Amino acid sequence: LFISFLVYQQWQLDKNPPVQQQTTEQTTAASSDVPASSSSSAEVVADSQTKGQIITLENDVLRLKVDTLGGDVISSELLKYDAELGSKEPFVLLKDTNEHVYIAQSGLIGKNGIDTKAGRAQYQVTGDNFKLAEGQNELSVPLTFEKDGVTYRKIFVLKRDSYDVGVNFEIVNQSGSAIEVEPYGQLKHTLVESSGNVAMPTYTGGAYSSSETNYKKYSFSDMKDKNLSIDTKAGWVAILQHYFV
């Protein structure tokens, strides 16, 4: 059970590309545009100390907390799964604490990107708690950021009885000049060792699916020691955590 955040995000972007009033040129963003993904857990935690407004999004199976600084998902609770046998608390998958970081980041990079190592977009939103209402099948929550005559909307979409988290970007360019941006997404996770026992070992690490290889696991040590960057026309990236895939 993996919250297919990045998969669904990319599907949405392919299906519904951002709308702009000015024609934009395609560009390949340098990797330095992407907010840093540190190999040190201490650095990762330090990187997340500055926060914006924390808002809550909830449907019937999932509760999310989103930081308006960047619009990152910093917490997810699986409401139909107990934290442990006999517990009344839901299982927490994504979290952002001093001891453990596992968050889903996404944004816009490139020449005119609003998410860089120098800073993230500070979105505005009306309200702080959004819940799927009785009889409602879809919850849509827009976050808005304006800069230099351009309005950016990052829209989260939750559907009833679904763990998918839709993330759409809408851009209204009234600046009079073309802009160059492209979407990025990444999962940020504290480095951990696999645990469990001999009879039932558990695994925490990464997994790729690409047009060349349907499924391949990568440990955190692989990520630390190797360049795992690949080019593919289709695929997904996931973090496997214990028995949740």
Annotate each predicted stretch with a short phrase.
Residues L1-V34:
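Subset of Sec-pathway N-terminal targeting signals
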Residues A29-I55:
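Short, Gly/Pro- and small/polar-rich lid/capping loops
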Residues I54, E58-V245:
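Soluble non-transmembrane domains of integral membrane proteins
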